[in-house]
Amino acid sequence: NVNFSAIFIISTTWIIYLNFFLRRVAKIKNKKWLSVLSKIYGFLVFIFIISFIIIEGLLIFNISQFKEAKDIEKMDYVLVLGAGLDGEKVGNVLKSRLYQAIKYYNLNNKTNIIVSGGQGKDEIISEAEAMYRYLIENGVNPNQIIKEDKATTTLENIKFSKEILKNRGDEDKKVLIVTNEFHLYRAMIIGDMLGIKNEGLASQTPIKIRINYMIREYTTIIIDVLRTSIYKIKSC
């Protein structure tokens, strides 16, 4: 992710530089098509910069608004989104998400916890199974844990979990989505788009890593909003 951020910043710098370069060339060459191309490109660069500022601004604002576990109302379902594993154990990022879920469970021990995450190519077991084991080890009633072990994307996390709720006759229940603060805004947007009543509980990420992930969220939010929109159209 550090590499992604570096590439993104360098690419953005070149995109902006190319805009000024095209304008200069168009002025020197005095070609109409170059002038038109320069204006179109300049407009696209403007849209890119404005959209980046808006999306990152919304992301930062929403992160500042997230509540602590103790301040969240009682809900029937908690949805923990998966992340990478360390062998058969949950990795540090996923452990931080489960820590928040357990903290909420201890305040509201009648809630059901959906653990959502499939098995990656380099993973021995599914993320859902690893989360299931970790929750049991930390005192969660296994009868209150529901495994969703097919999802490989955030959209699938939300979509497949919604199907679980529907099959249980609880489609209208409000869901507490648990993931890292940089990821939660996107997950909640998808939840809203798919008609899931939701609130968020964020786990913390070290600041040096968080910045990299937040920069990446600009592209992933756009991609996932488009994916979700296409999925909804196809589902009609």
Question: Which ranges hold each PLM region?
Answer:
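A structural signal for short, hydrophobic/glycine-enriched beta-strand patches
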Residues: S35, I54-R216, I230
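Membrane-interfacial entry segments at the cytosolic side of transmembrane helices
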Residues: N30-L44
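Hydrophobic membrane-insertion alpha-helices, especially the h-region
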Residues: Y41-E56
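Solvent-exposed, charged interface segments at domain starts and junctions
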Residues: N1-S11, W33-L37, I114, E148, ...
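Short hydrophobic helices that act as membrane-entry/anchoring signals
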Residues: Y213-Y231, S235
